[in-house]
């Protein structure tokens, strides 16, 4: 559906569920360079395909990730988060061993449809809010 405010349908169920998920690197180390950020974005896409979650907006910064999603009622967002983090770290660490390590856990809050535009705008504005955390295009940031 092109309108993410409409109800979604799945196996005789109608639903309208949204969440804002964030997770960060171990000790908030700014280890996500541009290549690792690309790995995170593709890992989130893979996790979405595997778990039935749909990304509405995301932002990958040097030390944390924001994702606004819609999801079915039978989805466990903890499974989505675990898969996205695992795939992202695996991909990034193939290029530079030990480059990306995530902190345990994540933050998630549900979003009412009336608040969805504001939350997606907040996530879209992350690079303006944190210009010092925009992933760099060159070099390999390694964790100490």
Predicted segments — roles?
Residues 1-144:
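Basic nucleic-acid-binding interfaces
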């Amino acid at each position: 559906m092109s309108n993410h405010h409409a109800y979604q349908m799945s196996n005789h169920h109608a639903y309208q569920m949204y969440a804002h998920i964030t997770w960060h690197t171990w000790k908030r180390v700014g280890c996500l360079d541009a290549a690792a950020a690309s790995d995170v974005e593709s890992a989130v896409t893979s996790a979405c395909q595997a778990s039935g979650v749909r990304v509405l907006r995301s932002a990958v910064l040097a030390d944390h990730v924001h994702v606004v999603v819609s999801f079915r009622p039978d989805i466990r967002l903890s499974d989505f988060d675990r898969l996205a983090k695992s795939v992202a770290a695996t991909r990034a660490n193939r290029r530079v061993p030990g480059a990306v390590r995530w902190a345990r856990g994540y933050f998630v809050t549900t979003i009412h449809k009336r608040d969805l535009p504001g939350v997606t705008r907040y996530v879209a504005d992350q690079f303006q809010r944190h210009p010092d955390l925009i992933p760099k295009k060159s070099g390999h940031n390694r964790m100490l």
